[in-house]
Design a protein with these regions (language model features):
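Catalytic cores of TIM-barrel enzymes
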Residues: 13-373
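Short, Lys/Arg-enriched N-terminal segments with co-localized hydrophobic residues
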Residues: 1-13
């Protein structure tokens, strides 16, 4: 459900009921207003608070294609702070205390308009080890200890004849088919019946959780969750420290993807989905449309929960070198366009991060309202 947008004290509230009656421009104005209101931060000085608000406004103006006071500076420096201080990525992945030590010093040395949180650069190594994640190779797990980054391990995690199962019930396919293929810890979920089998007299269903392998899995999940909270607390402390100094970490709705990439990156792999264009075009279209609705809802819910304004899309397989313009128009663009329009309708701003050249199809972005993409 869409959460209420709380205005400043003494003003009216925008409730879920009248939120649905607002235009996308009015919704965006409400989201921008909330985005610019600094939370209860113990700034180190009045100037730090002034800088915090000015920096956020600088980005909000740029996003909406208004002229900012100057060009905003957003430096995606990755794990550069670690290299700067002589540490490896693996050092920080397994010793979280290094993260604030290094990041806090880095941000006091180099002026910036935003603080790129270390969560996107430093994975919680022990969490990934615990759950047996096969989706990434990282230092000490598939890559040398001194590797400079981590690498997504693309694979065929959904077979070409499994489209019907995905379309019928994406959540069930994820839990009982996809996740067991990419996480060792999810293995026991292959053998349980769907949650929709819990209708009446449900007692027998819980026998699934008496199996030793399933109990081991649940224990692993709890331990991984506790470990992630340790990591999250450390990363959060970096964000809080930056905010005190007047450097915001803009709240976003996280990452979203073109449905073609969700299937091509996450499920079928590059070779698989390129074959599907010819072998299963109709089912591919149905699956992408099904996922588009889910992705819109997930991104909107994430922004409502965080107070975020921006949803970032890393665009992969729609690049000029991956497919022709005609293939882009038929397979990549329609479902991506649906997701973008769904987010615009909710007052969100879409950030399309083109990984590769999109010059041959850049003109298509012009169809959206000014200041929304």
């Amino acid at each position: 459900k869409k959460k209420q947008i709380q205005r400043k004290k003494g003003e009216n509230k925008v409730t879920e009921k009248n939120w649905n009656q607002l235009t996308h421009e009015e919704k965006r104005a409400e989201r921008v207003k909330r985005w610019l209101e600094p939370p209860d931060i113990p700034f180190v000085s009045p100037q730090a608070k002034k800088d915090y608000v000015a920096r956020l406004k600088r980005f909000a103006d740029a996003y909406r294609m208004k002229k900012p006071d100057r060009v905003p500076v957003d430096v995606p420096f990755g794990d550069l702070p670690l290299k700067w201080k002589g540490y490896t990525l693996k050092d920080a992945m397994y010793n979280y205390d290094l993260i604030p030590q290094v990041w806090n010093e880095f941000m006091t040395k180099f002026e910036m308009d935003t603080f790129p949180a270390p969560a996107m650069s430093v994975l919680p190594g022990r969490v990934y080890d615990m759950v047996g994640c096969h989706l990434y190779k990282y230092p000490g797990n598939g890559l040398p200890d001194n590797a400079l980054g981590f690498q997504f391990a693309e694979g065929e995690y959904m077979m070409g004849d499994e489209y019907d199962a995905l379309i019928k019930d994406p959540s069930d396919f994820w839990v009982r088919t996809y996740l067991p293929r990419v996480f060792t810890s999810f293995g026991p979920y292959r053998n349980i019946s769907p949650f929709t089998s819990i209708v009446e007299l449900p007692g027998g269903y819980f026998a699934n959780y008496a199996v030793p392998e399933m109990q081991k899995t649940l224990k692993t999940f709890m331990e991984a969750g506790e470990e992630f909270l340790k990591y999250s607390a450390v990363v959060g402390s970096c964000v809080e420290e930056a905010a005190k100094l007047g450097i915001p970490t803009p709240k976003t709705g996280g990452l979203d993807k073109a449905p073609f990439d969700t299937i091509g990156d996450t499920l079928r792999g590059t070779q698989g989905i390129m074959k599907d264009i010819y072998r299963h075009p109709d089912k591919l279209h149905i699956a992408m449309d099904r996922l588009a609705d889910i992705q819109i809802e997930q991104a909107v819910n994430a922004c409502n929960a965080s107070g975020g304004l921006l949803v970032t899309f890393p665009l992969h397989k729609g690049a000029d070198s991956f497919m022709s313009r005609k293939q882009f128009e038929v397979f990549y663009w329609p479902s991506l366009r649906k997701v973008i329009n769904g987010l615009i309708d909710e007052g969100l701003i879409v950030f399309l991060f083109a990984e590769g050249s999109y010059m041959e199809r850049l003109d298509m972005v012009n169809e959206f309202p000014k200041g929304t993409v």
